[in-house]
Curated annotation (Swiss-Prot):
GO terms for cellular component: cytosol. GO terms for molecular function: NADP binding; shikimate 3-dehydrogenase (NADP+) activity. It comes from the Bacteria. Pathway: Metabolic intermediate biosynthesis; chorismate biosynthesis; chorismate from D-erythrose 4-phosphate and phosphoenolpyruvate: step 4/7. It catalyses: shikimate + NADP(+) = 3-dehydroshikimate + NADPH + H(+). Pfam families: SDH_C (PF18317), Shikimate_DH (PF01488), Shikimate_dh_N (PF08501). The active site is at K70 (proton acceptor). The gene is aroE. CDD domains: NAD_bind_Shikimate_DH (cd01065). This is Shikimate dehydrogenase (NADP(+)). Homodimer. Shikimate binds at S19, L20, S21, T66, N91, D107, Y230. It comes from Prochlorococcus marinus subsp. pastoris (strain CCMP1986 / NIES-2087 / MED4).
Length: 285
């Protein structure tokens, strides 16, 4: 029951109307018996600083930050975790005793969750896309001790930036999507991760595969294919790879695991029920 003493958690982004976070977070909150409510707050770019700073003065226990603000909140934090600094993205904020924001990133934990029991040590990986999500993926692969990473993108500048940021941590290279090496790489790689929005619901390329279907003719049935998109589930890319005999993973587990890690962060280490969050999403969808 919501009372005058109920505290709140919120997701800040633009847009947020598609978000599933309130469904799974409120299910976990209810299960744990916490006097909290989680909601999504849309925010215009020009209003971000006003909104985030105003919330500090309310009965708020923490925030999730999503696109397009994961880098823009850095200047609003008095303390930032090492992992958030490394991937240059914050997705979770919590107020300290002085009512200042502490920023961290739980996307890495979320990304790792469905992979941690697959023994990927010394394996090779291919990342599709060089945007913000690729940073968390690279950091996660480093923590899983893979041997090398190749990033495929249409954008040379962002490729170079990622390589510069991570070249001291793992063997990493970037290729433009037109490179002739890619066909052989697709055939030989152990793990492929899609970080692009291609195939996502409510986009102009809902039915497409990253870089086009012909790009994937050489894919090997032994390859694990992981698409960070969770709506639709499965994506056209995962359907295609499943027909090729690949093991496939959608973004649902990452979504839940990063959310559980955020809720644990806000509640000072409370054990959060993954299955409760999963069941709530399954029922909703």
């Amino acid at each position: 029951m919501i009372t005058s003493k109920t505290s709140f958690l919120a997701l800040i982004g633009n847009p947020v109307s598609h978000s599933l976070s309130p469904i799974m977070q409120n299910a976990a909150i209810q299960y744990l018996g916490l006097d909290l409510i989680y909601m999504a707050i849309p925010c215009k770019n020009e209003d971000l600083e006003i909104v985030v700073n105003s919330i500090k003065k309310m009965n708020c226990k923490g925030l999730n930050i999503t696109i397009p603000f994961k880098q823009k909140v850095f200047d609003m934090c008095s303390e930032i975790s090492p992992v958030a600094k490394k991937v240059k993205a914050i997705n979770t904020l919590k107020l300290n005793d002085n009512k200042n924001w502490i920023g961290t990133n739980t996307d890495i934990d979320g990304f790792i969750y469905p992979l941690k029991n697959l023994n990927l040590i010394k394996k090779s990986s291919l990342i599709l896309g060089s945007g913000g999500a690729a940073r968390s993926v690279i950091q996660g692969l480093i923590e899983l001790k893979l041997s090398k990473i190749t990033i495929i993108s249409r954008k040379r500048n962002s490729l170079n930036e990622l390589i510069t940021n991570f070249k001291n941590d793992i063997e990493i290279k970037g290729l433009l999507s037109t490179n002739n090496e890619i066909k052989n790489l697709i055939q030989e790689t152990d793990l492929i991760i899609n970080t692009t929005p291609v195939g996502m619901s409510n986009t102009t390329n809902t039915d497409e595969l990253p870089f086009g279907q012909g790009f994937w003719d050489s894919i090997n049935s032994k390859t694990i294919v992981y698409d960070l998109i969770y709506n639709p589930s499965p994506t056209p890319f995962l359907k295609f790879c499943d027909k090729k005999g690949c093991m496939t993973i959608d973004g649902t587990q990452m979504l839940i695991a990063q959310g559980a890690k955020s809720l644990s962060f806000w509640t000072n280490g409370l054990e959060v029920p993954y299955e409760v969050m999963h069941d709530a999403l399954k029922e909703y969808l």
